[in-house]
């Protein structure tokens, strides 16, 4: 049967692969080639206050958190992802086994005995796992869009099957759920008008409400996450630590670094202390490596964050931040509204001996070039 809507599947998958699986490209050998194109799109979003927030992250990516709930999410992302992959593969094998050995028959056994679209449910679960690991607002919006398109794709497939198999498929519809077993939720009527302008308006309204609700939830999670990451802020300087360091230690490290004459001169040359300039500093254990931050040059390797670090030996990365919006940002709003970080100085301090061990000018960009990476 010819299907004029057959382009939906590759189109939906393209959105999913390019946007939602950014993290998988980032850690692969093709990362530089991928970002040679994708980074331009992310930077384009950052040029307008209307879209710059899409580059932001709404959950911690490399920072430890004092919230047990957030910490748990960081531990289960891989389990969710691989659970979804396993479910997808079971459905895949079942479909193609039926195509090979039971030609012309619909798939109604095993997973399909309770759910009509287990593979779409699997993709939903995979997306949750990826989003927990790489929680960019753009990923969130793309994920909701993908779910919305898959719902209508599933409805379209059901109409085709109903036309092809008739009463037997109608009976199957009556005893199964679309994405979850029917017994979980009971019978639910269609929530959209059948056809015409009313249906089109309802679809647009439903999509807007879903994306709006997801984004609002994302901003709430971002605010909650920042409250549970080690931080303190002044009017023009926000300070974060990926480690769970107390506020007094953060302040001590930053003030000691700023008291060094050479560092103070470097900061002043970039406008520190002048009005309407925003700065963000990271206080990081000396031995930690975080490729998401423009610190030391790191040609290879991922995150290295040993728990048994010396809390007195720290490095402080000072950056000047470009924020989106038409007014100046202060406090933690510098983090929430940050678009670009310009590295200024990387200062190594020993709090125990009250020494500045040295400072250097950090790399201009992260390993992947001028691409928006997580702020916390």
Where are the language model's segments positioned?
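Conserved SAM-binding loop
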Residues: 114-121
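Membrane-anchoring alpha-helices and their flanking helix-loop junctions
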Residues: 1-108, 126-375
């Amino acid at each position: 049967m010819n299907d004029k809507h057959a382009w939906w599947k590759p189109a939906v998958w393209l959105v999913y692969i390019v946007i939602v699986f950014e993290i998988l490209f980032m850690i692969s050998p093709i990362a530089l080639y991928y970002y040679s194109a994708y980074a331009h799109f992310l930077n384009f979003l950052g040029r307008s206050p209307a879209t710059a927030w899409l580059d932001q992250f709404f959950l911690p990516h490399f920072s430890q958190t004092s919230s047990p709930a957030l910490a748990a999410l960081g531990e289960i992302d891989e389990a969710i992802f691989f659970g979804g992959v396993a479910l997808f593969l079971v459905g895949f094998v079942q479909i193609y086994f039926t195509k090979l050995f039971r030609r012309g028959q619909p798939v109604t056994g095993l997973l399909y005995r309770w759910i009509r679209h287990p593979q779409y449910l699997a993709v939903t679960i995979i997306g949750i796992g990826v989003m927990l690991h790489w929680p960019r607002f753009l990923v969130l919006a793309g994920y909701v869009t993908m779910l919305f398109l898959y719902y209508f794709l599933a409805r379209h497939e059901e109409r085709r099957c109903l036309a092809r198999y008739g009463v037997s498929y109608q009976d199957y519809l009556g005893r199964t759920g679309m994405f979850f077993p029917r017994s979980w939720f009971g019978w639910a009527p269609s929530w959209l008008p059948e056809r015409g302008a009313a249906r089109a308006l309802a679809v647009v309204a439903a999509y807007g409400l879903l994306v709006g609700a997801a984004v609002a939830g994302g901003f709430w999670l971002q605010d909650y996450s920042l409250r549970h990451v080690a931080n303190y802020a002044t009017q023009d300087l926000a300070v974060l630590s990926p480690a769970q360091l107390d506020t007094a230690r953060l302040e001590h490290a930053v003030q000691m670094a700023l008291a060094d004459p050479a560092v103070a001169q470097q900061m002043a040359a970039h406008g520190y202390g002048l009005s309407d300039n925003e700065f963000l500093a990271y206080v990081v254990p000396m031995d930690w490596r975080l490729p998401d931050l423009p610190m030391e040059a790191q040609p290879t390797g991922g995150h290295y964050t040993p728990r048994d670090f010396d809390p007195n030996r720290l490095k402080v990365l000072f950056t000047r931040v470009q924020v989106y919006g038409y007014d100046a940002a202060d406090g933690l709003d510098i983090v929430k509204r940050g678009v670009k970080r310009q590295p200024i100085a990387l200062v190594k301090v020993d709090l125990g001996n009250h020494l500045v061990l040295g400072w250097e000018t950090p790399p201009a960009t992260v390993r992947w070039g001028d691409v928006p990476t997580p702020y916390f």
